[in-house]
């Protein structure tokens, strides 16, 4: 019943009945006059009633509002246009705009029902949004048509003049510029792009005036103050302009005005003078002017391709300065691996400090440092290693390589072996220095050479039991694994340690078995090392030597013992790798001499005739040693550098072991003794093994040839691996992938790659594509 009465009475309340009460409140709100709480609520109620009861009410309210808003704006227009001066006009406009813009948020609120009725919205479904309000749009559109569109160019010009004045150091009320921007941002009637008018006018004018300003100012500043002061100027202006842009330009997320302004400033202040600024880079790097370089870096990083020339300058400097320092110290570092590694580390730390302080460890500059340092490490100018290659019976030489991996291995040996260097260092210091070696090793191209030498040194340390710290020795194996050394190589090193531990158990069992037996030598004095041929990679060459009877008699006992525990395995004796301690007695005193098996065999020749002179020819017959090994062994006994009185004497005198003749006579020095602090010692111990290699000359040649042969096999394997996966591949792509696979071992030379491709084609593993000779196809 109530609903039907309402419908029957619909139309009884008209717009005209309420507008006279509503209008004074609307005018008060427009003029920013105070309104009571009751008037505010009455306005809400009256708008709601008119929209509900008068069918034409919403349209009439909209029209009436439009007229009153227009009238109010005309009054504001008159106040603004009364000023002829542009600055005064701008100030007056901003005063009026501020008041009006505030009311644009307040006046629409009581007219929510009008929004719902005109737009067909359901108030219960969607909250009214003031920014989308019809009343607000009406207010802003009317302001735009009546005032802003007519004077916007004058306002904009005035605003740009104020910004220009601020750049010259003058102060003003920043709200004058901000108000103009707000007008542009809020007075756009395009619903698709509300920032269109702002972008096309205010932003464009701001960017254009900025560019004009610096196109004039920058060149003259550069000419008057020079590049280095100009960089400070440009940096300061870029920061200043960014702060200014954040004040005066629109910063909402969908607008990129600040970014556009900064790009404009970079073009005017930096890009235009890119070549002039970059011309200073090389000199700054040489003079280590890190602060200036950092400033240049921050400027050039804003310019497309601005960093590339700096990277090139850094690379060139590191290579030239690094090699110059190495050449200057060549006399020392070529003979002293410790000094060599220290020199390399000094260079690395110096260049790393430069990159950190000047370029904040930017990845691009770190890459440039690494590339250049790698060139220094692998340079073969100062000292080189030539690896021989036997091919079809002809001795060839590969392209010379840096001796760096060999010297790094030598330095590791000095740290890991019992040496004066390792003795004065703590375990922590040794570990730190080994980690430094591994750092340099990362830059070595031909790591396989390091592996060969490192393994040779490790073999010597384990066999002679001269490791400074067994725990660090084993840690080193894991560190090599961590830095990416090939697994098969690292596994062999680990197996070597395993063999030593197994040998210790075997020795214990052997001694236990023979503790009550009478052997040629007491079991306690014997230390047997049973080594796996695969892990230790010993040469197939066996050097024969006539052993003393005591050793000859011991060998069958060891073999019998081993066969009982390991049936089916055969022992191959490597006397070359053996060593022992013998006692030397004379009238002066008694001395223990640590000797190789070859030295022992030579010295035992005098056991039955201690005072006789024996010729080189007879010693050869007695020991049955090869000529080269006998010469080397004798020289170690007649010219041992640490002894003031040598073990053997000889005549006539010669300059090198090569000068020994069949008739050279050798005799035991009956006055041999150890001298300490200029005093003759009656007892003592001396190691005569020294740096004698536990390999023959031929074995060393084999090892160097082995490096090359292994490279050939690795290259062939890698090519087959790639071809199996790709089936068909271009020459360029094959070479790229090949280097990627082999880079942790060595860098294959183009000549070697070409030769192995031809070998694989010849043996029908791959073939050339008939339509393109630079494409290869895998043959299953």
Swiss-Prot record:
<feature type="modified residue" description="Phosphoserine">
    <location>
        <position position="34"/>
    </location>
</feature>
<keyword id="KW-0945">Host-virus interaction</keyword>
<dbReference type="GO" id="GO:0031146">
    <property type="term" value="P:SCF-dependent proteasomal ubiquitin-dependent protein catabolic process"/>
</dbReference>
<dbReference type="InterPro" id="IPR045093">
    <property type="entry name" value="Cullin"/>
</dbReference>
<dbReference type="GO" id="GO:0000082">
    <property type="term" value="P:G1/S transition of mitotic cell cycle"/>
</dbReference>
<feature type="modified residue" description="Phosphothreonine">
    <location>
        <position position="210"/>
    </location>
</feature>
<dbReference type="GO" id="GO:0097193">
    <property type="term" value="P:intrinsic apoptotic signaling pathway"/>
</dbReference>
<dbReference type="GO" id="GO:0038128">
    <property type="term" value="P:ERBB2 signaling pathway"/>
</dbReference>
<comment type="function">
    <text>(Microbial infection) Following infection by HIV-1 virus, CUL5 associates with HIV-1 Vif proteins and forms a cullin-5-RING E3 ubiquitin-protein ligase complex (ECS complex) that catalyzes ubiquitination and degradation of APOBEC3F and APOBEC3G. The complex can also ubiquitinate APOBEC3H to some extent.</text>
</comment>
<keyword id="KW-0675">Receptor</keyword>
<feature type="domain" description="Cullin neddylation">
    <location>
        <begin position="711"/>
        <end position="772"/>
    </location>
</feature>
<dbReference type="InterPro" id="IPR036388">
    <property type="entry name" value="WH-like_DNA-bd_sf"/>
</dbReference>
<dbReference type="GO" id="GO:0038023">
    <property type="term" value="F:signaling receptor activity"/>
</dbReference>
<dbReference type="GO" id="GO:0004842">
    <property type="term" value="F:ubiquitin-protein transferase activity"/>
</dbReference>
<dbReference type="GO" id="GO:0043161">
    <property type="term" value="P:proteasome-mediated ubiquitin-dependent protein catabolic process"/>
</dbReference>
<dbReference type="Pfam" id="PF00888">
    <property type="entry name" value="Cullin"/>
</dbReference>
<keyword id="KW-0832">Ubl conjugation</keyword>
<dbReference type="GO" id="GO:0005829">
    <property type="term" value="C:cytosol"/>
</dbReference>
<comment type="subunit">
    <text>(Microbial infection) Interacts (via the substrate recognition component) with HIV-1 Vif; forming an active cullin-5-RING E3 ubiquitin-protein ligase complex (ECS complex).</text>
</comment>
<dbReference type="GO" id="GO:0030674">
    <property type="term" value="F:protein-macromolecule adaptor activity"/>
</dbReference>
<dbReference type="InterPro" id="IPR036317">
    <property type="entry name" value="Cullin_homology_sf"/>
</dbReference>
<comment type="subunit">
    <text>Component of multiple cullin-5-RING E3 ubiquitin-protein ligase complexes (ECS complexes, also named CRL5 complexes) formed of CUL5, Elongin BC (ELOB and ELOC), RNF7/RBX2 and a variable SOCS box domain-containing protein as substrate-specific recognition component. CUL5-containing ECS complexes specifically contain RNF7/RBX2, and not RBX1, as catalytic subunit. Component of the ECS(ASB2) complex with the substrate recognition component ASB2. Component of the ECS(ASB6) complex with the substrate recognition component ASB6.</text>
</comment>
<dbReference type="GO" id="GO:0019005">
    <property type="term" value="C:SCF ubiquitin ligase complex"/>
</dbReference>
<dbReference type="GO" id="GO:0070979">
    <property type="term" value="P:protein K11-linked ubiquitination"/>
</dbReference>
<keyword id="KW-0833">Ubl conjugation pathway</keyword>
<comment type="function">
    <text>Core component of multiple cullin-5-RING E3 ubiquitin-protein ligase complexes (ECS complexes, also named CRL5 complexes), which mediate the ubiquitination and subsequent proteasomal degradation of target proteins. Acts a scaffold protein that contributes to catalysis through positioning of the substrate and the ubiquitin-conjugating enzyme. The functional specificity of the E3 ubiquitin-protein ligase complex depends on the variable SOCS box-containing substrate recognition component.</text>
</comment>
<dbReference type="InterPro" id="IPR019559">
    <property type="entry name" value="Cullin_neddylation_domain"/>
</dbReference>
<dbReference type="InterPro" id="IPR016157">
    <property type="entry name" value="Cullin_CS"/>
</dbReference>
<dbReference type="GO" id="GO:0005634">
    <property type="term" value="C:nucleus"/>
</dbReference>
<dbReference type="GO" id="GO:0016567">
    <property type="term" value="P:protein ubiquitination"/>
</dbReference>
<feature type="cross-link" description="Glycyl lysine isopeptide (Lys-Gly) (interchain with G-Cter in NEDD8)">
    <location>
        <position position="724"/>
    </location>
</feature>
<dbReference type="GO" id="GO:0031466">
    <property type="term" value="C:Cul5-RING ubiquitin ligase complex"/>
</dbReference>
<dbReference type="InterPro" id="IPR001373">
    <property type="entry name" value="Cullin_N"/>
</dbReference>
<dbReference type="GO" id="GO:0005262">
    <property type="term" value="F:calcium channel activity"/>
</dbReference>
<dbReference type="InterPro" id="IPR016159">
    <property type="entry name" value="Cullin_repeat-like_dom_sf"/>
</dbReference>
<dbReference type="GO" id="GO:0038026">
    <property type="term" value="P:reelin-mediated signaling pathway"/>
</dbReference>
<comment type="similarity">
    <text>Belongs to the cullin family.</text>
</comment>
<dbReference type="GO" id="GO:0090734">
    <property type="term" value="C:site of DNA damage"/>
</dbReference>
<protein>
    <recommendedName>
        <fullName>Cullin-5</fullName>
    </recommendedName>
</protein>
<dbReference type="GO" id="GO:0031625">
    <property type="term" value="F:ubiquitin protein ligase binding"/>
</dbReference>
<dbReference type="GO" id="GO:2001222">
    <property type="term" value="P:regulation of neuron migration"/>
</dbReference>
<dbReference type="GO" id="GO:0160072">
    <property type="term" value="F:ubiquitin ligase complex scaffold activity"/>
</dbReference>
């Amino acid at each position: 019943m109530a609903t039907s009465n309402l419908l029957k009475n619909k139309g009884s309340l008209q717009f005209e009945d309420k507008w006279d009460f509503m209008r004074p409140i609307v005018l008060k709100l427009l003029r920013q006059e105070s309104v009571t709480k009751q008037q505010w609520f009455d306005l809400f109620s009256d708008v709601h009633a008119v929209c509900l009861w008068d069918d034409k009410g919403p349209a009439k309210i909209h029209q009436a509002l439009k007229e009153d808003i227009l009238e109010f704006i005309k009054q504001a227009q008159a106040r603004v246009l009364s000023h002829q001066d542009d600055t005064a006009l701008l100030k007056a406009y901003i005063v009026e705009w501020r008041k009006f813009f505030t009311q644009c948020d307040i006046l629409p609120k009581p007219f929510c029902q009008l929004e719902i009725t005109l737009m067909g919205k359901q108030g219960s479904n969607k909250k009214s949004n003031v920014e989308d309000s019809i009343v607000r749009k009406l207010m802003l559109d009317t302001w735009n048509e009546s005032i802003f569109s007519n004077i916007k160019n004058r306002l904009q010009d005035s605003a740009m003049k104020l910004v220009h004045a601020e750049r010259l150091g003058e102060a003003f009320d920043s709200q004058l510029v901000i108000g103009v921007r707000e007008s542009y941002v809020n007075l756009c009637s395009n619903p698709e792009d509300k920032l269109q008018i702002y972008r096309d006018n205010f932003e464009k004018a701001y960017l254009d005036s900025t560019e004009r300003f610096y196109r004039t100012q920058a060149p003259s500043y550069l000419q008057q103050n020079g590049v280095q002061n100009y960089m400070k100027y440009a940096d300061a202006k870029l920061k200043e302009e960014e702060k200014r842009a954040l004040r005066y330009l629109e910063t909402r997320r969908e607008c990129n005005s600040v970014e556009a302004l900064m790009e404009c400033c970079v073009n005017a202040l930096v890009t235009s003078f890119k070549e002039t600024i970059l011309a200073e880079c090389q000199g700054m790097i040489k003079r280590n002017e890190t602060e200036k370089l950092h400033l240049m870096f921050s400027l050039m990083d804003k310019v497309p391709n601005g960093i590339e020339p700096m990277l090139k300058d850094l690379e060139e400097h590191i290579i030239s300065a690094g090699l110059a320092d190495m050449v200057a110290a060549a006399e020392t570092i070529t003979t002293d691996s410790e000094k060599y590694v220290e020199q390399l580390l000094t260079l690395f730390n110096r260049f790393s400090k430069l990159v950190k302080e000047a370029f904040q460890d930017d990845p691009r500059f770190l890459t440039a440092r690494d590339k250049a340092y790698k060139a220094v490490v692998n340079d073969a100018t100062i000292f080189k290693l030539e690896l021989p290659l036997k091919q079809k019976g002809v001795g060839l030489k590969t392209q010379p390589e840096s001796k760096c991996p060999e010297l790094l291995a030598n330095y590791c040996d000095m740290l890991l072996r019992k040496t004066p260097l390792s003795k004065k260092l703590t375990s922590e210091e040794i570990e730190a220095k080994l980690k430094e070696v591994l750092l340099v090793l990362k830059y070595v191209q031909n790591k396989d050479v390091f592996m060969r030498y490192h393994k040779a040194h490790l073999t010597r340390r384990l066999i002679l039991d001269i490791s400074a710290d067994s725990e660090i020795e084993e840690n080193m194996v894991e560190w090599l694994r961590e830095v990416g050394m090939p697994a098969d190589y690292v596994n062999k090193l680990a197996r070597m340690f395993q063999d030593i531990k197994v040998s210790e158990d075997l020795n214990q069992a052997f001694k236990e078995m023979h503790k009550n037996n009478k052997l040629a030598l007491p079991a306690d004095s014997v230390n047997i090392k049973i080594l796996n041929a695969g892990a230790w990679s010993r040469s197939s060459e066996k050097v024969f030597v006539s052993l003393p009877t005591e050793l000859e008699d011991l060998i069958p006992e060891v073999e019998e013992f081993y066969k009982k525990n390991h049936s089916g395995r055969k022992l191959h004796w490597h006397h070359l790798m053996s060593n022992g301690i013998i006692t030397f007695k004379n009238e002066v005193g008694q001395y223990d001499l640590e000797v190789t098996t070859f030295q022992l065999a030579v010295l035992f020749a005098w056991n039955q005739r201690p005072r006789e002179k024996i010729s080189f020819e007879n010693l050869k017959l007695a020991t049955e040693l090869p000529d080269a090994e006998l010469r080397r062994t004798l020289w170690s006994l007649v010219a041992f550098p640490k002894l003031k009185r040598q073990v053997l004497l000889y005549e006539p005198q010669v300059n090198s072991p090569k000068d020994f003749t069949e008739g050279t006579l050798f005799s035991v020095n009956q006055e041999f003794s150890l001298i300490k602090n200029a005093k003759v010692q009656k007892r003592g111990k001396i190691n005569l093994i020294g740096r004698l290699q536990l390999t023959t000359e031929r074995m060393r040649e084999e090892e160097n040839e082995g490096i090359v042969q292994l490279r050939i096999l690795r290259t062939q394997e890698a090519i087959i691996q790639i071809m199996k996966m790709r089936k068909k591949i271009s020459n360029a792509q094959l070479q790229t992938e090949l280097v990627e696979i082999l880079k942790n071992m060595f860098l294959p030379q183009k000549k070697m790659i070409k030769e192995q491709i031809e070998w694989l084609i010849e043996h029908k593993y791959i073939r050339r594509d008939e339509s393109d000779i630079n494409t290869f196809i895998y043959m299953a």
